[in-house]
């Protein structure tokens, strides 16, 4: 029979889920970080990842709208500001667009979403649906993938700067900001989950929420790997580096 865990035991279980299932374990990330992708494959990653970046503040706004405690809302709304910024040139979304600009992707193509892989779109929409439909505790728990973000960000920045001459430190500014934002956000979310997951059922739900979020991130990389690495089957309406690079230059 499952026993009620102490808060620290619950944290250990959550960290074990991340150690096993977080997308730093995905083969696509190994290729990205070790310089094994070509420019077109890196472009495809950045373009598809923008859909996830674009929806982060939508996700956080959905969670915020369900918080009845003003003190809790004041803390959570910082996440929206981090990504939306205080002006069109500020925030995480703007910094990601700076990356796609630096990679030579037409901004209209990126922002329109018309060249996304179906798997990307479905995974992101599944995440938005989850935070809107599940309990507030589960929605907050689903954000706990940020516990594991600093490690993968460090690998990504170092690897991309070492291996890709078309990437600059300025282009990767998004990740430098996340090195401070993600730990702040995950510390708060972890404390909230440890405090409020006070029954066996709730503890099972928060672990399932983190498991689900890991699957969302993993599914996005699965879609990229199938389309742009092996077997190389690209959805006909999705980004094709050769075709869309020519379109960008026209």
From Swiss-Prot:
Q: Which residues cross the membrane?
A: none
Which biological pathway?
Answer: Cofactor biosynthesis; pyrroloquinoline quinone biosynthesis
A Pfam family (short name) is TENA_THI-4
User: Gene3D superfamilies from the entry?
Assistant: Heme oxygenase-like (1.20.910.10)
- Catalytically driven reaction(s): 6-(2-amino-2-carboxyethyl)-7,8-dioxo-1,2,3,4,7,8-hexahydroquinoline-2,4-dicarboxylate + 3 O2 = pyrroloquinoline quinone + 2 H2O2 + 2 H2O + H(+)
The role this protein plays is: Ring cyclization and eight-electron oxidation of 3a-(2-amino-2-carboxyethyl)-4,5-dioxo-4,5,6,7,8,9-hexahydroquinoline-7,9-dicarboxylic-acid to PQQ.
UniProt GO MF annotations: pyrroloquinoline-quinone synthase activity
Gene Ontology terms: biological process: pyrroloquinoline quinone biosynthetic process; sulfur compound metabolic process
Enzyme Commission number(s) of this protein: 1.3.3.11
> What is the name of the protein in this document?
Pyrroloquinoline-quinone synthase
List, alphabetically, the InterPro entries matched: Haem_Oase-like_multi-hlx (IPR016084), PqqC (IPR011845), PqqC-like (IPR039068), Thiaminase-2/PQQC (IPR004305)
HAMAP family in the record, alphabetically?
PQQ_syn_PqqC
Q: Which UniProt keywords apply?
A: Oxidoreductase, PQQ biosynthesis
**What gene makes this protein?**
pqqC
Protein's UniProt keywords contain Oxidoreductase: yes
């Amino acid at each position: 029979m499952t026993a009620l865990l102490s808060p620290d035991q619950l944290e250990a279980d959550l960290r074990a889920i991340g150690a096993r299932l977080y997308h730093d374990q995905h083969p696509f990330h190994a290729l990205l970080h070790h310089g094994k992708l070509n420019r077109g494959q890196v472009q495809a990653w950045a373009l598809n990842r923008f859909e996830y970046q674009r929806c982060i503040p939508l996700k956080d706004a959905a969670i915020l709208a369900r918080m009845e405690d003003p003190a809790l809302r004041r803390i959570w709304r910082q996440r929206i500001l981090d990504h939306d910024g205080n002006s069109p040139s500020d925030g995480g979304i703007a910094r990601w667009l700076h990356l796609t600009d630096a990679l030579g992707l037409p901004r209209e193509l990126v922002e329109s979403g018309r060249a996304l892989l179906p798997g990307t779109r479905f995974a992101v929409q599944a995440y938005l649906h989850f935070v809107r439909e599940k309990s507030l505790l589960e929605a907050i728990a689903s954000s706990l993938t940020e516990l594991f973000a600093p490690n993968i960000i460090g690998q990504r920045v170092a690897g991309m700067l070492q291996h890709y001459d078309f990437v600059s430190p300025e282009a990767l500014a998004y990740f430098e900001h996340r090195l401070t934002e993600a730990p702040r956000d995950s510390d708060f979310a972890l404390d909230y989950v440890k405090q409020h997951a006070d029954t066996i059922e709730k503890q099972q739900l928060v672990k399932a929420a983190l498991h689900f979020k890991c699957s969302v991130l993993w599914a996005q990389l699965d879609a990229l790997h199938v389309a742009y690495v092996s077997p190389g089957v690209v959805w006909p309406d999705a980004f094709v580096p050769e075709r869309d690079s020519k379109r960008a230059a026209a």
